[in-house]
């Protein structure tokens, strides 16, 4: 039986019912709906709608229902109830009879679903924060094990300057640190209770909403009922957080897909996160990483879809807002799964140090060092830049590295170049010179690892 049938003389068309009902996805809010209902029952005692005995009877029945839901949440899907609120109320009435019909006094599904969704989001944020932190830890652990793994750094996907695999890991650690911070900020804004705002104008009962918020574990209660039942900013923020986080994971995946390719061959992925070809026996495909990269698009789509759903809605509640859940549920599930999978990839990764170093020594990645050397000799940087460009052209013509050019050849481009240039052009020197904060020198990378460990402690 629908919760709103009294106004209607005809039953809903079955096709409309299937189109309208949301239990198939909002059943995931069952625990939150029950918790919110327990809180509301306590509030109704304070305004003399329920006696203490009635409230205790309702709470006991709701607690029992919560245990059932936690044991088998998908059993809810066997019902033909319209939504999770209807299901909980109908089950409650089965347990306590007509007393269950009193629980919805002064409450609307509009403030009820807003409360359920915020409680669910709070729980999801706690899980996501843990997952982000676990991947941060995995990146720091991998960085610490690969401080001496020198590899090319890239701009425009062309070798630019030498870095280390540790420095690369720490770059993604910084991105994930920002992801964590965004989740924490989002939690601060959504941690306000909608319950007691009714359909749109507030409840007619003198409920102490701040006390109710405290019972439910919120920091405070919302301040405007019209805004409260219409507000889905927290959904947009979480989808934005997930979208940004997935962009970071997609870039992480793309880098490792390239590093794992035969063309780069900097790393080898574990058999545990790769698959083969049904035709080509030699193939070892980076499927885990490709799926992370591919799943980024569906999360971006969920954010865009929710933006478009909300952009034209008048105040207050509209049924369009039922579309807030499926995309959110899927996006956060996807983000969580990809965080876990990225950590699994790092667990078994093998860095091929000799090949990484060989690649770092190619591509004239020490050209900037030669330019800096000339500047130290008094040559203006723009002129030094031009001189080094000419020297690189000559090195390419001879098929040699810059440091392999004879001194006489180098001096054709600038007379200030002396024998002391060769130690400057050495690979380790290129790293050692990048000793400012955030740089790739061994000392700075070690310091960054230590700092990251402290932040994770």
Swiss-Prot record:
Indicate where this protein resides in the cell: Cytoplasm
Q: Where is it mainly found?
A: cytoplasm
Write down the Pfam families for this protein, in alphabetical order: ASL_C2, Lyase_1
Alphabetical list of InterPro entries matching this protein: Arg_succ_lyase_C (IPR029419), Argininosuccinate_lyase (IPR009049), Fumarase/histidase_N (IPR024083), Fumarate_lyase_CS (IPR020557), Fumarate_lyase_fam (IPR000362), Fumarate_lyase_N (IPR022761), L-Aspartase-like (IPR008948)
Name the GO cellular-component terms.
cytosol
* Reactions this protein catalyses: 2-(N(omega)-L-arginino)succinate = fumarate + L-arginine
Give GO MF terms, alphabetically: argininosuccinate lyase activity
Q: Which UniProt keywords apply?
A: Amino-acid biosynthesis, Arginine biosynthesis, Cytoplasm, Lyase
What Enzyme Commission number(s) appear in the record?
A: 4.3.2.1
Per the record's keyword annotation, is Repressor included, yes or no? no
**Pathway(s) of this molecule:** Amino-acid biosynthesis; L-arginine biosynthesis; L-arginine from L-ornithine and carbamoyl phosphate: step 3/3
* GO biological process terms, semicolon-separated: arginine biosynthetic process via ornithine; L-arginine biosynthetic process
What HAMAP family is this protein classified in? Arg_succ_lyase
> What family classification does the UniProt entry report for this protein?
Belongs to the lyase 1 family. Argininosuccinate lyase subfamily.
Q: What is the official name of this protein in its record?
A: Argininosuccinate lyase
What's the encoding gene here?
Answer: argH
């Amino acid at each position: 039986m629908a919760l709103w049938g009294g106004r209607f003389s005809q039953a809903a068309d079955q096709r409309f019912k299937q189109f309208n009902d949301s239990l198939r996805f909002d059943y995931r809010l069952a625990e939150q709906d029950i918790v919110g209902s327990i809180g509301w029952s306590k509030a109704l005692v304070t305004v003399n709608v329920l006696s203490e005995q009635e409230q205790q009877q309702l709470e006991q029945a709701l607690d029992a229902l919560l245990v059932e839901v936690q044991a088998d949440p998908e059993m809810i899907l066997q019902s033909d109830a319209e939504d999770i609120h209807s299901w909980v109320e109908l089950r409650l009435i089965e347990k306590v009879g007509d007393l269950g019909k009193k629980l919805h006094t002064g409450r609307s599904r509009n403030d009820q679903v807003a409360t359920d969704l915020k409680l669910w989001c709070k729980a999801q944020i706690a899980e996501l924060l843990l997952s982000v932190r676990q991947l941060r830890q995995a990146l720091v652990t991998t960085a610490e094990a690969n401080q001496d793994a020198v590899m090319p750094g890239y701009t425009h996907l062309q070798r630019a300057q030498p870095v280390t695999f540790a420095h690369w890991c720490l770059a993604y650690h910084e991105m994930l640190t920002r992801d964590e911070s965004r989740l924490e900020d989002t939690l601060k804004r959504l941690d306000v209770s909608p319950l007691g705002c009714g359909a749109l104008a507030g409840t007619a009962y003198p409920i102490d909403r701040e006390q109710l918020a405290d019972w439910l574990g919120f920091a405070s209660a919302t301040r405007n009922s019209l805004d409260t039942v219409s507000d889905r900013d927290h959904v947009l923020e979480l989808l934005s957080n997930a979208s940004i986080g997935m962009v970071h994971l997609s870039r992480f995946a793309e880098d490792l897909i390239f590093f794992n390719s035969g063309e780069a061959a900097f790393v080898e992925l574990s058999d545990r996160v790769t698959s083969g070809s049904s035709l080509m026996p030699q193939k070892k495909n980076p499927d885990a990483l490709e799926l992370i990269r591919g799943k980024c698009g569906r999360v971006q789509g969920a954010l865009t879809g929710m933006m478009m759903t909300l952009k034209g809605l008048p105040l207050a509640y509209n049924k369009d807002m039922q579309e807030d859940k499926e995309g959110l549920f899927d996006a956060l599930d996807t983000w969580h799964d990809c965080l876990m999978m990225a950590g699994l990839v790092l667990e078994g990764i093998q860095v091929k140090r000799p090949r990484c170093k060989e690649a770092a020594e190619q591509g004239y990645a020490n050209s900037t060092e030669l330019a800096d050397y000339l500047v130290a000799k008094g040559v203006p940087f723009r002129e030094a830049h031009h001189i080094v460009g000419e020297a690189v052209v000559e090195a390419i013509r001879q098929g040699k590295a810059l440091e392999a050019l004879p001194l006489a050849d180098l001096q054709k481009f600038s007379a200030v170049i002396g024998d002391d240039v060769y130690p400057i052009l050495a690979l380790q020197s290129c790293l050692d010179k990048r000793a400012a904060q955030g740089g790739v020198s061994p000392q700075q990378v070690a310091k960054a690892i230590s700092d990251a460990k402290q932040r994770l402690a």
